[in-house]
Regions:
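Hydrophobic alpha-helical transmembrane segments in multi-pass integral membrane proteins
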Residues: 18-61
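Hydrophobic, aromatic-rich transmembrane alpha-helices
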Residues: 34-45, 157-166, 291-308
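Transmembrane alpha-helices of multi-pass inner-membrane enzymes
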Residues: 36-41, 161, 311-323, 327-343
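Aromatic-anchored transmembrane helix interface
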Residues: 54, 63, 72-97, 110
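Alpha-helical transmembrane segments of multi-pass inner-membrane proteins
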Residues: 94, 103-138, 144-200, 310, ...
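A membrane-periplasm/extracellular boundary helix in multi-pass inner-membrane enzymes
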Residues: 115, 121-124, 180, 197-234, ...
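Hydrophobic transmembrane alpha-helices and their immediate junctions
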Residues: 190-194, 198, 203, 288-319
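Long extracytoplasmic/lumenal interhelical loops at the membrane interface
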Residues: 230-244, 248-252, 256-289
């Protein structure tokens, strides 16, 4: 077996470990090192679409014009996430060259996260101790190895799209999704279902599935804590405040932005895992790369939309979710997206 294929299998073996594969005291994961090796081995085969380079150029421009605002060390550090984003995009031509079947690997990834998550929910339901490591303190929510029920929930939604209603794996993913108590993920699933019903003209099935989901949500246990209250309002108020902050940051530099991934230097809590982003991917792009960056990113998304139904359904889920989380720039979601683009 060629070394490239071995590394791809290794990549998907590592991914379910989530935050456990993060290197100590570094914003780098083991899977990042595997991807770096893949790029080095396949450099001559890597040719990226123009839409990707346009967005990268807009990000670089945003960093260059803000170099005197932050200084070179801060700009260099901020640019590392752009390097990661570009590295993940480089997986696409590597997959295309190897002609590898990624569906079984993606199915393994989401099911592994679901099984690990269900075990975590049963054995370690109280994960508030993770707050000392600057993670959110969750109580009786399924977080698996990702430590974030919202991004994890989106992975389960994408897995449901991929499995296309195969009963056993879909049931496992749906149960895991329910126990994340992630409203943004529930909404993503509902919108995907509605979009599919619109295409297939099967509205009766959608209506039945919709009310079945509502009934299942009603039956969910409420063991205590705000996180499991689906009617919780504090997170809505927090998100609205986050949106206002994002628009305020954008107004500081509306054309070219404040610099890609520089928001940590404007936040009150720069060590938090959420300090570098906003609760909306489009607002994140707008604030950091300005109108120029947002237009190039929308152009990239438009180019991706003109492909398979699987990709369209996956994009619908991610785009809906990204209105409430910075989903489009979450590592695991980015890797998943480029895999589906290849499929």
């Amino acid at each position: 077996m060629p070394l490239t294929k071995i590394l791809i299998y290794l990549l998907f073996f590592i991914l379910p470990f989530g935050q456990l594969e993060r290197l100590p005291n570094l914003p780098v994961y083991l899977h990042d090192l595997v991807i770096l090796l893949l790029i080095i081995l396949n450099l001559k085969f890597i040719k990226l679409p123009r839409s990707i380079w346009l967005f990268v150029s807009a990000c670089l421009l945003s960093l260059i014009v803000n170099i005197f605002r932050f200084g070179f060390p801060q700009i260099l550090f901020s640019s590392l996430y752009l390097v990661r984003w570009l590295a993940y995009a480089c997986l696409l031509p590597i997959y295309q060259h190897e002609k590898i079947d990624l569906k079984p690997l993606l199915k393994y990834l989401c099911l592994a996260l679901a099984v690990l998550g269900l075990l975590q929910y049963l054995l370690i339901p109280d994960t508030r101790f993770l707050a000392v490591l600057n993670w959110d303190d969750h109580y009786y929510r399924l977080i698996s190895t990702v430590f974030d029920p919202n991004y994890l929930g989106l992975i389960f939604v994408l897995g449901l799209v991929l499995f296309n209603l195969k009963i056993l794996p879909s049931l496992i993913l749906l149960i895991a999704l329910l126990f994340t108590y992630s409203r943004s993920s529930y909404l993503a699933l509902i919108v995907v279902g509605f979009y599919l019903a619109l295409i297939k003209k099967k509205f009766k099935i959608f209506i039945f599935a919709f009310f079945a989901l509502i009934f299942a949500l009603y039956l969910l246990p409420r063991p205590g804590g705000e996180g499991v209250k689906l009617e919780r309002w504090f997170s809505v108020e927090s998100r609205l405040g986050n949106y206002r902050e994002g628009f305020g940051l954008w107004q500081k530099s509306p054309v070219s932005g404040l610099g890609f991934n520089t928001l940590r230097y404007f936040r009150n809590d720069p060590i938090s895992h959420a300090a570098a982003g906003l609760d909306n991917s489009f607002l994140f792009v707008l604030a950091t790369t300005g109108i120029i960056g947002l237009l190039t990113y929308l152009n990239l998304l438009k180019s991706l939309w003109q492909t398979s139904l699987l990709l369209k359904l996956s994009l619908v889920a991610i785009l809906v979710h990204s209105l409430f989380q910075n989903s489009l720039f979450y590592p695991l979601i980015m890797i998943w997206l480029w895999c589906v683009v290849y499929l």
